């Protein structure tokens, strides 16, 4: 059995780490490099770096920040933000990223997933999915350009359909960003994760809702996700990564202890 992964996330806008609630009303958290180093030192299994407005702004993630973070960490490093071509991806990887993640650009051009997977290998290609539960229809829909609330839009894709589509096209991993739970810290959407797990045959990462150590345990134990991503509980030092991993190990979760 592969060890479960704990993954802190740096949402970056205008050169600073920010955090919102349900992808809105972002507050400034702090400087990028010190936070990245802190999480690596605490025992994170991987670090995710999202330039949250790159896609909606029509630009690519700032490569200088990628290189600065890569210099201070020694854990796998996944980068997202406006990657629209093989050339974009190659540059990000050359600046120190280990994996690239695409989200809105994949929705705009699904063939991008296959082209990137063919060029760099499926193990290098992560697809992020921003999913919103519509209480009126009882359905989960994929949203696009969520880093800028003024430009966010609902796509024609239902979440389960898109999960299956991106796998067919070569996604090596999926990060499910559950927008309703984002920043609320009331727990992951276990029901949605179970539904996605049933149709997801590549590594699946839960994102959105962690508020306690028990929430991580529930995600691993009840939905069999491969990793759990979180931001605010780590940024605000509500949970220490090392202590979280010790707790999970004590509960019988296969986890890497530094």
Curated annotation (Swiss-Prot):
**What are the EC numbers?**
4.3.2.10
List where this protein forms a coiled coil. Answer: none
Subunit comment? Heterodimer of HisH and HisF.
Q: Which GO terms describe its cellular component?
A: cytoplasm
BP terms from Gene Ontology: L-histidine biosynthetic process
| Pfam families assigned to the protein according to its UniProt record, in alphabetical order | His_biosynth
- Biological function: IGPS catalyzes the conversion of PRFAR and glutamine to IGP, AICAR and glutamate. The HisF subunit catalyzes the cyclization activity that produces IGP and AICAR from PRFAR using the ammonia provided by the HisH subunit.
GO MF terms, alphabetically ordered: imidazoleglycerol-phosphate synthase activity; lyase activity
- Major enzyme class: lyase
Family according to the record: Belongs to the HisA/HisF family.
Q: Which residues form the active site?
A: 11, 130
Keywords, sorted A to Z? Amino-acid biosynthesis, Cytoplasm, Histidine biosynthesis, Lyase
Reactions accelerated catalytically = 5-[(5-phospho-1-deoxy-D-ribulos-1-ylimino)methylamino]-1-(5-phospho-beta-D-ribosyl)imidazole-4-carboxamide + L-glutamine = D-erythro-1-(imidazol-4-yl)glycerol 3-phosphate + 5-amino-1-(5-phospho-beta-D-ribosyl)imidazole-4-carboxamide + L-glutamate + H(+)
Name the record gives this protein? Imidazole glycerol phosphate synthase subunit HisF
């Amino acid at each position: 059995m592969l060890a479960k992964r704990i993954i802190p996330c740096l949402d970056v806008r205008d050169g600073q780490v920010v955090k919102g609630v349900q992808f809105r009303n972002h507050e400034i958290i702090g400087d990028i490099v010190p936070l990245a180093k802190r999480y690596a030192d605490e025992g994170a299994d991987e670090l995710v770096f999202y330039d949250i407005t790159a896609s909606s702004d029509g630009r690519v993630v700032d490569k200088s920040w990628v290189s600065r973070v890569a210099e201070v960490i020694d854990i796998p490093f996944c980068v997202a933000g406006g990657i629209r071509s093989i050339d974009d991806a190659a540059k990000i990887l050359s600046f120190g990223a280990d994996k690239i993640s695409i989200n809105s650009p994949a929705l705009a051009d699904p063939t991008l997933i296959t082209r990137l997977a063919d060029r760099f290998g499926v193990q290098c290609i992560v697809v992020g999915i921003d999913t919103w539960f519509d209480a009126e229809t009882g359905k989960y829909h994929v949203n696009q350009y969520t880093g800028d609330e003024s430009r966010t839009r609902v796509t024609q894709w239902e979440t389960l359909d898109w999960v299956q589509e991106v796998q067919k096209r070569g996604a090596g991993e999926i990060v499910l960003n559950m927008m309703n739970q984002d920043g609320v810290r009331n727990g992951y959407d276990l029901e949605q994760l179970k539904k996605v797990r049933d149709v997801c045959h590549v590594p699946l990462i839960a994102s959105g809702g962690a508020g306690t150590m028990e929430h991580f345990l529930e995600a691993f134990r009840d939905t069999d996700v491969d990793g759990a991503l979180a931001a605010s509980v780590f940024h605000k030092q509500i949970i220490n990564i090392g202590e979280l991993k010790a707790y999970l190990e004590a509960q019988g979760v296969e986890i890497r202890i530094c």
